[in-house]
Amino acid sequence: NEETIAVFGLVNSTVFQDFPKLKIIVSHGGGAIPYQLGRFEAPSLRRGTGKRFSDGLRQLYYDTVLYTEDALRLLIKTVGADRCLFGTECPGTGSSVDPVTGRSMDNVKPMLENIETVSAADKQKIFCDNAKAVFNLK
């Protein structure tokens, strides 16, 4: 998907060296990047530049528009809570309801609130503090 391609291209470019103050927020939790991290990390190590793909991921920010708790947990584990910003697609495709469970697909807020392995401080970062920092808000 397009998020995966964009993240791969940005991390493997010099854009953050050329524009060190640039802040980019990637939609949909970075696409397949967290799930396929090992496949992207291996070539970066093979190049022998000393630059790990996973370190480059932490130069970007990611929204939490992911529809499963497992995907959300993996994103936070992969890039860190300080690189995640709360996001939603409601109304829109996120308004879809799973006919089996009755759950709205884009119920990120309660889903994140109920992940016990994410601390209250990290939840505060994701819901509020990170956006304030990215957009220089008080």
Kindly label every feature range from the protein language model:
Residues 1-14, 18-19, 23-138:
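H/E-rich (His + Asp/Glu) clusters that bind or coordinate divalent metals
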